[in-house]
Every structure is written in C-alpha cells, then in structure tokens.
Amino acid sequence: ARKQINKLLYAKLGTNDVRKKWWNPQDENNEKNGYQQEKFKFKDYAKWTGDYIFMRIEEMFLTAAEASCRLNDDKGARLMLNSLMQERDEDYTCKKTGTALGKLTSDETGSLLEEIIIQRRIELWGEFGRIYDIRRLKQGFRRTADMGWPSSALIASTDTEDPESYAWV
C-alpha cells in the first residue's frame, strides 16, 4: 500500500492550499483515517525512474524560519514562513509568536515554532525522515489507528512517548 497522510495533518491545510492535490481523499484504497498520496509518481514503473529529492528551496525557507524563531526573531520567522506559504495558499497568514512545543508531536501549543514545524511536516511529507525532526525537537509521539496508522505501524510495544528513548529509533 502507498503511504497515506493522516487526516489530522491533512486538515491543517487551508481550503486553497495547492498542496491538497498531493493527496487523494476520494481514493478507494484509503485507510479509515488516511489519504493516499499523489505527490510522488514513477515516470516509468518498469525502470523505477522517478524523482529523487535531496533538498528543495522550500526546505531552506523553513529552516531559515525555524532558525529566526529560535533566535527570538518572530518577525523574521513569520516573513520567511509567509513568503513560502503565499506560494501554497494565498489566504494564509501567520501571526503567531513563541517557541513552545508540546511533549508529544500531537500536543498543540499554538506557537510560531509549532506552526513552522507543521508546515515543514506538510511540505516535506514523504521526502525527509520525519523521525529525525522528532528526535531533534526532543518530542515523543503517539500513533493510533484513529490517526490513520495501519496496525503494522503502531509500534504498540515501544514507548514512543518518551523523547529520550532510543527504542524507537
């Protein structure tokens, strides 16, 4: 089965966000709480020819936004984030401030840093090792079937909520 975005993350996309086309909510193969991805397609299935993404300018914008935010330059961080997002959703405007993050990736604080991380998750979905961001941010995570995770990916026997645990790396 192809990878699917969970509905909770998909719901964070604005109504006019062009990235919504990266997933198909109508696909007959969707899991209960996930949507099939349309972001990556093979040019030639027989030869496995396709896109190999190493870094995009969008990642640079998001990295600069995060760095500015961590340096308490909320204005600069919002400028970088809003510049990128105007290419994705012309209705998007971020006015958030602060660097608070929840203990778990699903714990929302409403901070600017959290918004940058959410947009990073969406923008780089399927391209970059999300697990490295989770480790770097010192957050734990929780996977549930309600979030769209198949039973094989739930990691039920591992304490993923402890950000210091190396059992899930």
Region spans (language model):
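His/Glu-based metal-binding/catalytic segments typifying zinc-dependent metallopeptidases
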Residues: 1-8
